[in-house]
């Protein structure tokens, strides 16, 4: 199974609720960077991982600590079956980068194990299980472009008439999502209870208007991420000086994404940023499909 990375085209964050969670209004877009999860029958349970050269060997937790273990446990408990199988994760989505790579793995694992175990779980039940795993997991199942509300886990597909090109620059060190939210709370103690709506962004993508999209991109967590990691602000400035229509921190960071006008524009910007000393620079288009079958092993 293959599942995509996501970028947040809009991320409005409200003040924390009594339960500690922040209400969100976000627009997700699935982009063409993928993790692959392969599931094979086996008498016991095991999870392995393959990483590209630019990822640290310890970037993905194993030994029962991976989100795919929790996905398997939830699916098995839902149907009253035993957790068995051999899963292998081939990573390509930046880890701890604000692009929901772990959520993509969980979504792919749910679909792969549902097929492996012959369960035929309904789409509604898969989405409910996904929401229990994390706010980004339901979207990784759906893909495309979608509006997320609540904690981001209530996902509604939206009209998107564009094909958008992005340059993605991951960081060699992660940035803790909880710490970014805590820093947001410190920086903005008077944040409104209701998040900034996404009307301008939704209008831009419905019209397929690249310049309107560039103007409408919004991330309330960007200031907190840049305050914690000032080099992210310098990277965004560098990308925009090199011709990006707009750059921003993806989600809670530290990955930065840059909107480009075409595939050629994206390749040119990627080459420029790579030449400026960034060791990993990726180009990707969106929107793309959510978790889907690639082949049976």
From Swiss-Prot:
It comes from the Bacteria. It catalyses: 4-CDP-2-C-methyl-D-erythritol + ATP = 4-CDP-2-C-methyl-D-erythritol 2-phosphate + ADP + H(+). GO terms for biological process: isopentenyl diphosphate biosynthetic process, methylerythritol 4-phosphate pathway; terpenoid biosynthetic process. Belongs to the GHMP kinase family. IspE subfamily. The active site is at residues 6, 136. ATP binds at residues 94-104. It comes from Nocardioides sp. (strain ATCC BAA-499 / JS614). The keyword DNA repair does not apply. One of its GO terms (molecular function) is ATP binding. InterPro entries: GHMP_kinase_C_dom, GHMP_kinase_C_sf, GHMP_kinase_N_dom, IspE, Ribosomal_Su5_D2-typ_SF, Ribsml_uS5_D2-typ_fold_subgr. Catalyzes the phosphorylation of the position 2 hydroxy group of 4-diphosphocytidyl-2C-methyl-D-erythritol. Keywords: ATP-binding, Isoprene biosynthesis, Kinase, Nucleotide-binding, Transferase. This is 4-diphosphocytidyl-2-C-methyl-D-erythritol kinase. NCBIfam families: ispE, PRK03188.1. The keyword Nucleotide-binding applies. Pfam families: GHMP_kinases_C (PF08544), GHMP_kinases_N (PF00288). Its EC number is 2.7.1.148. Pathway: Isoprenoid biosynthesis; isopentenyl diphosphate biosynthesis via DXP pathway; isopentenyl diphosphate from 1-deoxy-D-xylulose 5-phosphate: step 3/6.
